[in-house]
Amino acid sequence: MNMANFLRGFEEKGIKNDRPEDQLSKEKKKILFSFCEVCNIQLNSAAQAQVHSNGKSHRKRVKQLSDGQPPPPAQASPSSNSSTGSTCHTTTLPALVRTPTLMMQPSLDIKPFMSFPVDSSSAVGLFPNFNTMDPVQKAVINHTFGVSIPPKKKQVISCNVCQLRFNSDSQAEAHYKGSKHAKKVKALDATKNKPKMVPSKDSAKANPSCSITPITGNNSDKSEDKGKLKASSSSQPSSSESGSFLLKSGTTPLPPGAATSPSKSTNGAPGTVVESEEEKAKKLLYCSLCKVAVNSLSQLEAHNTGSKHKTMVEARNGAGPIKSYPRPGSRLKMQNGSKGSGLQNKTFHCEICDVHVNSEIQLKQHISSRRHKDRVAGKPLKPKYSPYNKLQRSPSILAAKLAFQKDMMKPLAPAFLSSPLAAAAAVSSALSLPPRPSASLFQAPAIPPALLRPGHGPIRATPASILFAPY
């Protein structure tokens, strides 16, 4: 079937007929007969039809039809009705099932596919198990039905105290349980509590009688108030003297507001200080003496019962083998009223190990060292090996060294000498046996001088004695 010749003749006939009705019929016929049923391709012009009919794919399909074999369905993109067109555009339907284009498109103005909106919720509703599907299946359904699921925002986990961001909950949990976070939280709590405590002291200074505000109609209460006011006024001028006495004794100075309350001065002050430190440690979960942060009260109790904490307490009190001494020039720092663990500005001496340290950090390092632990446990000292020999003070070892050197200074046996000297030494030992070997090897003149004549070379007649000595 020669389609190109048929279309040429059809165009020549159309050129002769110039009427508008003939032109419309010509366009319709062109649409009808510009479709290749063999290759299932829509052609837009006679030139395309000619190029297609001369192509290899069209000839191959025509040959297969003539031989009685069904042609394979052509696979191409669905955009076959493009204006430019190509030689091999097809749709997914086979040639036998596909209807002519004119029947599907009554006019050229109608679009080939009508777009209709697809509701994403209804599309997801078609699949009841959409949320439990695999990610690959969800992606396929979203691509085919146009369901757009908004991407989930990554949850940002951050610590506002430490100014850190985390990638997971486990990282955040580990950070919250750590010591760095606990220290920063405690520092923030301390800064928040300080402004609350300062105005109370200032108010106590400004109004010394503010603690005696309740006034009743009884005369006895008024007399008690007057007595307390007198006691407070008398205690104010003597506060400087008591402060200087406390500084001389080496204890921590009391704040100036503490002198106004007579109950604090009369009662036992050190007991209340220890209790306040314990309460602060329980509240903050922090040991200010050892500078250790814990996560629970059980850990704090275990730390307080440990040997390190006990030795630090003994060093502060001076009751154990570790003694503390004030460092020179530390009184000026103590006058500033800086509160701490009580171990600042001090030097320490460990009586067990006979070691002097200069600071609290060095004391902690010494307490945690193996040397101190072995001494406390009563283990013997391990010898230290060094490449340098130190002079030992004991006279017995020095005497042994001298005796060893004298023994090594004895002359050598003749077997260690060269061959001519060895023969001479053997003859002399056979003829004369002296009681003690002297510095010279040959004493008796029994050997003729011809044997002792110096030979050629480096051999000498009377060589010096060879001695072995330590390095």
Curated annotation (Swiss-Prot):
Lineage: Eukaryota, Metazoa, Chordata, Craniata, Vertebrata
Annotated tissue distribution: Detected in germinal center of lymph node (at protein level). Expressed in spleen, lymph node and tonsil.
Region (Interaction with p53/TP53): 94-471
UniProt-listed SMART domains: ZnF_C2H2 (SM00355), ZnF_U1 (SM00451)
Zinc finger motifs (Matrin-type), residue ranges: 34-64, 157-187, 282-316, 348-378
Keyword Transferase: no
Origin species: Homo sapiens (Human)
Primary location class: nucleus
Region annotated Required for induction of apoptosis, chain positions: 1-93
Protein function: May play a role in p53/TP53-mediated apoptosis.
Gene name in the database record: ZNF385B
Residue ranges, annotated region (Disordered): 50-92, 175-275, 318-340
Biased composition (Polar residues): 206-220, 260-269
Assembly and binders: Interacts with p53/TP53; the interaction is direct.
GO-annotated molecular function: nucleic acid binding; p53 binding; zinc ion binding
Protein known as: Zinc finger protein 385B
Low complexity compositional bias, start-end: 76-92, 230-250
Alphabetical keyword list: Apoptosis, Metal-binding, Nucleus, Repeat, Zinc, Zinc-finger
A GO CC term assigned to this protein in UniProt: nucleus
